[in-house]
Amino acid sequence: MPDEKLPQYNEVWNDLEKGCLHSCPSYSVNNHVNNPIVKQNSTLTQPSLRKKNTMAAPARLRKRSENVRLTQARYAIFHIFLPFILTLLLYHNFYNYFDQALADLNSVVKYVIETIVLIFTYVMTVIIVYFSFSLIKLAFEEAYVYAPSVAKANEGLAKHVAKTIAGLVKYVAKAIQGLAHIILSLLLFILGLEVIEQDEETGDVEMSSMRGQAITTEPASDNTMAEGTDCNTSKDVESGSS
């Protein structure tokens, strides 16, 4: 029966009498759910009738990791491996086909071109190494995620063993990441040494060329001095004879 003291209950009661609880435009779902009288019997508050995600957690993680691997593989093929192969071909053919052309250029231009090619090659090598270690780290992280789900929940010992293995795998992944950073630092250090050594070689070549020019000019000055002394001696001889 409708009650004048409960207008919200009267609204729901009228909707029930009309037989259009979920179809009447005047019905408010929020009012129905928040109503304490019908809250216990409401189908909207029952967890079993709510929309659930039918995909399990490991399946979602597996699908997400597969998408990540696919994206990284595409990025590696089109942005890393192909440019790296082209760089290696360029670096291999650089001294075979362009050595004679560079010999005719200035030493500074030759040094700049060789430095650019060397830096580009090392940068691509660093990217390859970092990407490889990132894939290894991703594999270990996936093992860390899936290791506890391998063991069943009711098997206590197997579950603890799986968690222990997962923890070890996590630390191994961190160690691999640190090793990748160490290798990157070593590669950059080697790159710096190569550039310094190349700079020293060009400096030695310039110094040797300057020394060669000095050596070639010194005998000419000696000859002129000798000629000058000969002239003076001849003049002295002529004056003495006279």
UniProtKB/Swiss-Prot annotation:
Name of the protein in question: Uncharacterized membrane protein C18H10.18c
Amino acid composition bias (Polar residues), ranges on this chain: 210-232
Coiled-coil ranges from the UniProt annotation: none
Membrane-crossing residue ranges in chain numbering: 75-95, 116-136, 176-196
Annotated region described as Disordered, given as residue ranges: 204-242
An annotated GO cellular component: membrane
Basic and acidic residues compositional bias, start-end: 233-242
Species: Schizosaccharomyces pombe (strain 972 / ATCC 24843)
